[in-house]
Curated annotation (Swiss-Prot):
Signal peptide residue numbers: none
Protein name per its UniProtKB record: GATOR2 complex protein Wdr24
Gene3D superfamilies (alphabetical): YVTN repeat-like/Quinoprotein amine dehydrogenase (2.130.10.10)
Function: An essential component of the GATOR subcomplex GATOR2 which functions as an activator of the amino acid-sensing branch of the mTORC1 signaling pathway. The two GATOR subcomplexes, GATOR1 and GATOR2, regulate the mTORC1 pathway in order to mediate metabolic homeostasis, female gametogenesis and the response to amino acid limitation and complete starvation. GATOR2 activates the mTORC1 signaling pathway through the inhibition of the GATOR1 subcomplex, controlling the switch to cell proliferation and growth under nutrient replete conditions and during female oocyte development.
SMART domains noted in UniProt: WD40 (SM00320)
Chain positions of all zinc fingers (C4-type): 703-726
This enzyme's EC code(s): 2.3.2.27
Positions contributing to Zn(2+) 2 binding: 730, 733, 752, 755
Alphabetized UniProt keyword annotations: Autophagy, Cell cycle, Cell division, Cytoplasmic vesicle, Lysosome, Metal-binding, Mitosis, Repeat, Transferase, Ubl conjugation pathway, WD repeat, Zinc, Zinc-finger
Length: 776
């Protein structure tokens, strides 16, 4: 029956329970449902407008035999129920009796928890159960003991199902990822055994019309196996969570329902021909769904129970269709710079000739429209690949190399060869300019040379540090310089006295100083340096000239002293770069004042001025870096910023933008698997958010090899459930592993990597459990 003619009388119903149920089962007439849980064992009648409680088998009993993991209803007798309890007890119930007599039989033969129980499809007295002890028991309710025991050679049997196609065949799935087929008459050995999943298999279900077996596992996959002859994988469905239950949809060959054990609370119906998105979803539950069942042959009614203590009767017409809300287009950027784009192909009817374009033909075309369930898997898409033209970038390597390879090689080459620390800035710029030139990045080469010219030979400090060096004479550096000048003052005084007596300096690069007032001599006749100034050497003067104090240099003289000085003496300045553009005055000796005013700051003539520009390049450099990022070269923009060191504080670039550059460049390095280079960039970052990237996703969660439980304790290899450290031992030699540990994600066993290399050179299965480990 197609989806377009669903039963519109079917509605969604909900009922709250006293406790959450672990399993559900329907009777042969599909008008009653049995619910079993840790504190729940009831039977409800299914009505058109809800559920009605008809039997409570637990009552006030607190026996663990009533704490059930699974429940099964006989397919031939509506009065017979079976439950599998957490203490390993398998109970048979007769609903036609009263009180305690309802518990017809109690089989206490399993040594550990019983996970599943099911009745034979054609024999009303036969049922089988699977347990954590790795055994399968076959019971005849006419006997008080099991009639057969099947040893699965695994740690736990999670589900068993009778085949609807062969009377004596049943399947069993285990926590070691294997699937077994057994003949009830041959208890000593299974017929077929194969590894279906790389993790525990929790559920299985036979297809009602085809010889297909569906399995669900912790690896978040649903697999459909063709059991005709040798088992073969037909379809695989990838889900987002661990699969807990699967049920084939009646009257729909390719539809199967599933629910998850964790994370995902919804019930999904999948079309195995389009496995990447559910055909329909039921999202009513607010906690993990623990059981699902179709109401007999009605493909539009689904029953589900959950840990939210509710039971739902879902109408298929109320299900959501994820495919209708999904984006039918997708795009991805490749590592070579190409772009892949996929979009849905719209189905258009072929154009017909004018003669045939009649009302009758259009009527026929409308009648042949396919149903929604059929159209779902017929949807298909087309993918396009867009390549970037060679003229897009200004970084060509050679005309013989294709554009994607150029960008790929230049990025990787620069990432590996660019140096961002460990040398002087001038050396870094020179090296990185050569690397950029080598890979044809001419704009980057120019930028590196510019950085070398303006930042490599000059020392830039924050503005407040520059101003304090001249305005605050109490600065420790200036105090040391004043002490040095005071110690050399007598010698300088003698030299200056000789110059003022008429001796002409031999060279034009010597220092001229104004006549010193007699007040600078103390009463004791001892000469002291001027208290209002500090005499600096030429080297010190040059090192002090920066952009912020450049205005202190006037006409070739640098003034050191109180800024409020009303008068300064001017002497003939020597020819240099700063005063070359100013007119020179020929001053005679008579024009000089014979005695300077008291407390006049010393005026020193600078013989050489460094080639510092009269403008600051910081804004220009920041604009250049932003432009490099805008054209897609975030590699150059960020490496320049890192190489600048403390000078980057002078650039007016927002930290949020720099953080975005870091994330972008690190992501690009990860795309090319340049892990070491990405780590170095992260370590050189001065932003806390970027520095913490190396601390993310460094933990590898493991499971116990004995019980399969995740290890989340404080001690690394100690299992809180098993109370042992068996997982820390090598499965080959049996000794505790110290150092490199090789671990199988499928069976959770491992050991010394050297021992496993030798073992798997000759074997293919795990030495401890027989799991088919994918060792490489």
């Amino acid at each position: 029956m197609p989806d377009s003619v669903e039963d519109t009388s079917t509605i969604s119903l909900r009922i709250c329970l006293e406790g959450h149920a672990n399993a559900l089962a329907l009777n042969k007439d599909n008008n009653q449902i049995a619910l079993a849980g840790r504190s729940l064992l009831k039977v409800y009648s299914i009505n058109s407008n809800g559920f009605t409680e008809s039997c409570n088998m637990r009552g006030k009993n607190q026996n663990l035999s009533y704490s059930a993991n699974d429940v099964a209803w006989s397919t031939l007798d509506s009065n017979l129920l079976a439950t599998a309890a957490t203490n390993g007890v398998v109970s048979v119930w007769d609903l036609s009796k009263f009180g305690r007599q309802k518990q017809l039989l109690v089989y206490n033969e399993h040594e550990r928890t019983a996970h599943t129980v099911t009745f034979h499809s054609s024999e009303p007295n036969i049922l089988i159960s699977g347990s954590q002890d790795g055994t399968i028991k076959c019971f005849d309710i006419r006997s008080d003991k099991s009639i057969n025991t099947y040893f699965c050679n695994s740690e736990s049997v999670r589900d068993v199902k009778f085949s609807p196609h062969t009377q004596n065949i049943f399947s069993a799935v285990s926590e070691n990822g294997t699937v077994q087929l057994w003949d009830m008459r041959k208890w000593d050995k299974c017929m077929v055994q194969f590894t279906a999943h790389y993790g525990p298999v929790y559920t299985c279900d036979w297809h009602p019309t085809r010889n297909w077996l569906a399995t669900g596992s912790r690896d978040k996959q649903i697999k459909v196996w063709n059991m005709d002859g040798r088992p073969g994988l037909e379809h695989t469905i990838h889900t987002i969570a661990v699969v807990g239950r699967v049920k084939w949809r009646p009257e729909r060959t390719y539809h199967i329902a599933s629910c998850a054990l964790v994370v995902d609370y919804s019930v999904h119906v999948w079309d195995i021909r389009r496995p990447y998105i559910p055909f329909a979803s039921f999202n009513e539950h607010t906690n993990v769904t623990t059981g699902i069942a179709w109401q007999g042959s009605d493909s539009h009614c689904l029953l589900s129970i959950s840990k939210d203590s509710t039971i739902y009767k879902h109408a298929f017409k109320d299900a959501t269709r994820p495919a209708l809300k999904a984006n039918a287009q997708g795009a991805s950027l490749g590592r070579f710079g190409d772009i892949s784009f996929a979009n849905k192909i719209k189905e258009y009817e072929p154009k017909t000739s004018g003669a045939s374009n009649t009302k009758s033909s259009s009527f026929i075309r409308r009648k042949t429209n396919v149903a929604g369930s059929i159209q779902f898997h017929l949807d298909h898409s087309k993918m396009y690949k867009f390549m970037v033209n060679d003229t897009f970038s200004g970084y060509p390597l050679s005309e013989s190399v294709s554009r994607p390879t150029q960008e790929h090689e230049s990025f990787i080459g620069c990432a590996r060869e660019l140096v961002i620390s460990g040398k002087k800035l001038s050396e870094l710029c020179e090296h990185n300019a050569e690397v950029s030139k080598k890979y044809g990045k001419h704009n980057a080469t120019t930028l590196w040379n510019f950085i070398k010219l303006f930042y490599g030979s000059n020392h830039f400090e924050p503005p407040f540090e520059h101003r304090s060096s001249f305005s605050n004479q109490k600065n420790p550096m200036n105090s040391r310089r004043a002490t040095q000048v005071a110690s050399d003052w007598p010698q300088q005084r003698t030299e200056l006295g000789q110059d003022l007596n008429g001796n002409t300096p031999e060279t034009a690069h010597e220092i001229d100083v104004a006549n010193v007032d007699d007040d600078t001599l103390g009463s004791s006749g001892v000469e002291h340096p001027p208290t209002s100034s500090v005499i600096l050497s030429e080297t010190q003067i040059i090192s002090e000239i920066t952009f912020d104090n450049f205005e202190l240099l006037r006409n070739g003289f640098i003034y050191v002293g109180p800024t409020e000085c009303p008068k300064a003496l001017a002497f003939p300045a020597l020819h240099h770069d700063v005063q070359a553009a100013r007119p020179q005055l020929d001053l005679k000796a008579s024009d000089h004042e014979k005695s300077p005013p008291p407390h006049v700051p010393t005026v020193l003539k600078v013989s050489h001025v460094p080639p510092i520009p009269m403008w600051e390049p910081h804004k220009f450099v920041s604009d250049a870096l932003m432009l490099m990022n805008d054209v897609g070269d975030v590699q150059t923009a960020l490496t320049v910023l890192i190489a600048l060191g403390e000078a980057r504080k002078l650039l007016p670039i927002d930290d949020a933008l720099v953080e975005h550059w870091f994330y972008t460049y690190v992501d690009q390095l990860h795309r090319y698997e340049l892990w070491n280079e990405a780590c170095e960039v992260i370590n050189r970052s001065w932003l806390r958010s970027v520095q913490q990237l190396n601390q993310h996703s460094t933990a590898m969660h493991t499971n116990c090899g004995e019980c399969g439980r995740p290890m989340g304790g404080k001690v690394g290899w100690y299992c809180d459930k098993c109370k042992s450290m068996q997982s820390a031992k090598c499965c080959v030699c049996g000794l505790i592993v110290r150092g490199v540990y090789a671990w199988c994600q499928g069976c959770s066993h491992g050991g010394h990597i050297e021992h496993l290399q030798k073992y798997f050179a000759k074997h293919s299965k795990c030495p401890k459990c027989g799991h088919l480990c994918a060792y490489s």
